[in-house]
Amino acid sequence: MSEEQLKAFIAKVQGDSSLQEQLKAEGADVVAIAKAAGFTIKQQDLNAAASELSDEELEAASGGGDTGIQAVLHTAGCYGGTKMCRA
C-alpha cells in the first residue's frame, strides 16, 4: 500500500540527513527521491498527506511550491522558506 510506503519514507527521512538534504534542494522530486531510497509512493499520496495539514501547517512548511513536497517536509521536520530539517 502506498500510504504505508509514504509513512515508512517519512520515518526514514527523519533519521537520514542525506535524504533531508535531497529534499531541501530547490525543485526536489519527492517521488523520485523516495524511489531511489527504495520506496514506492505516488504524487496522489503526497497530495492526500498535504490535504490533512492545516493551513497554518502548510504555511509553516514552505512559502509556496508543491503541497505534496510541503507535506513530506513538514512531517519530516523541515520548516520555513529555507526548508531547514531537524536531525
From Swiss-Prot:
One of its GO terms (cellular component) is extracellular region. The modification 2,3-didehydrobutyrine is found at residue 67. Induction: Down-regulated under nitrogen starvation. There is a cross-link at residues 75-85 (Beta-methyllanthionine (Thr-Cys)). Cross-links are proved in vitro, when coepressed in E.coli with the ProcM lanthionine synthetase. The beta-methyllanthionine residues have a DL configuration (with 2S,3S,6R stereochemistry). Keywords: Secreted, Thioether bond. It comes from the Bacteria. Signal peptide: none annotated. There is a cross-link at residues 78-82 (Beta-methyllanthionine (Cys-Thr)). InterPro entries: CHP03798_Ocin (IPR022516), Nif11 (IPR012903). Its main location: secreted. It is found in: Secreted. Residues 1-64 form a propeptide. Coiled coil: none annotated. Lanthionine-containing peptide (lantipeptide) with unknown function. Does not show antibiotic activity against Lactococcus lactis 117 and Bacillus subtilis 6633 bacteria. Organisms that produce this peptide live in oligotrophic environments at very dilute concentrations, suggesting this peptide is not secreted to influence other bacteria. This is Lantipeptide prochlorosin 3.3. It comes from Prochlorococcus marinus (strain MIT 9313).
